[in-house]
């Protein structure tokens, strides 16, 4: 099934896409536990993030060499095409992350979690605007169930942060508005990535390379005035690192490549389903390895996630005009 502008509508998932989705769910779900066990507290965050981006670029280039797309890259690649397909989404994601950091300081975990999950709706909205991919009534219902499940999971795992000392104006301008803007930007960036891969036929591996380079450059510029930059100058780039630190760094890099593949083949909306499902995986792994039982929120969210995935998969939008023809 294709939309009017030539983009493929991911109404059904093939074996390859299902495999990518399962891998991403497991990786995203296991990442918090792996990071907690393998990264020491004195490791400078910027050093792990930059190393992750470098590993991501190396892995993507290896995969491109393996599938033969690296050979024709010199002839096909253009700066304008790269900036349009990858530069813009990378810049949007960087701004989104900054807005989330601002808002989290001014909102309690419940309000933050609820507002942050609206990105699923905005992804569906921008997918319709940019790619003309419509959702059926039941799919919209499935998105509502998914957001409910995401909020329950986020609240169950969230901290008991109290923002009672923050006045209403500060909460609005430094909390609510930034997180809503971040949700809009998240939906826009995800849809742009899907557009670049499905309409412009931009390789997901190439997008990973380009976005990692742009993101790394933005991060390097930010270190000029950030505490992490001062810490790197004082203690060195690999301060606090051990051999185990590479495990979560490599895992996170592979997860970034999987995000690109899932977005490219299944779409940004389905990526949202994968990310929420991964929260359940995290809860189960915490129970298995740390003895921490799933919260009541998690137990309530489990059937909601399963129902939403089933509904979204079984009842795609069908164009009545095309059906008659």
Curated annotation (Swiss-Prot):
Localization, UniProt: Endoplasmic reticulum membrane
Pfam families for the chain: Nuc_sug_transp
Gene designation per UniProt: ROCK1
GO cellular component, one term: endoplasmic reticulum
Native source species: Arabidopsis thaliana
Lumenal side: 35-42, 131-135, 193-203, 263-270
Domain of life (superkingdom): Eukaryota
Keyword vocabulary terms for this entry: Endoplasmic reticulum, Membrane, Sugar transport, Transmembrane, Transmembrane helix, Transport
Example GO biological process: regulation of shoot apical meristem development
Main function: Mediates the transport of UDP-linked acetylated hexosamines across the endoplasmic reticulum (ER) membrane. Facilitates UDP-N-acetylglucosamine (UDP-GlcNAc) and UDP-N-acetylgalactosamine (UDP-GalNAc) transport. Regulates the cytokinin signal in meristematic cells through modulating activity of cytokinin oxidases/dehydrogenases. Part of the ER quality control system, which determines the fate of aberrant proteins in the secretory pathway.
Designated name of the protein: UDP-N-acetylglucosamine transporter ROCK1
GO molecular function, one term: sialic acid transmembrane transporter activity
Classification via InterPro entries: Nuc_sug_transpt
